[in-house]
């Protein structure tokens, strides 16, 4: 794994406190990916940019009835610290879970 000091806390947190995986690590960027339930894909792309800040692209996608995922949300956030990145990762997991639960509830309502 090729990473530097910019990702130490993030990697530790993801590995020990989430069900997400770290893919494609580089010296200035990492990609964090995981499924939430069967139908939600959560990806957080993190790159160290100017002044050592973190640019985070959060991609939350839904897989409906076909085999392809459709992006539902894709905000870009720039934060200053690893702790802020960790908060964004937690928020993306929470939003993904809410999306999954909402879709399941709507599907259930339609089937009743």
Labelled PLM ranges:
Residues 1-39, 68-73, 99-112:
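Negatively charged, low-complexity tracts enriched in Asp/Glu with abundant Ser/Thr
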Residues 11, 89-90:
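A generic alpha-helix structural signal
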Residues 81, 90-101:
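Charged, terminal alpha-helix-loop-beta segments
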Residues 88-89, 106:
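Terminal export signals
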């Amino acid at each position: 794994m090729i990473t530097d000091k910019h990702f130490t806390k993030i990697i530790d947190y993801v590995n020990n406190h989430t069900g997400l995986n770290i893919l494609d690590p580089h010296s200035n960027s990492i990609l964090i990916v995981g499924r939430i339930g069967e139908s939600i894909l959560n990806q957080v792309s993190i790159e160290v940019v100017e002044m050592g800040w973190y640019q985070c692209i959060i991609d939350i996608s839904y897989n409906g009835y076909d085999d392809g995922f459709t992006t539902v949300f894709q905000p870009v956030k720039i934060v200053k610290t690893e702790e802020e990145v960790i908060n964004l990762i937690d928020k993306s997991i929470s939003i993904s879970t809410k999306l999954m639960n909402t879709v399941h509830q709507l599907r259930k309502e339609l089937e009743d």
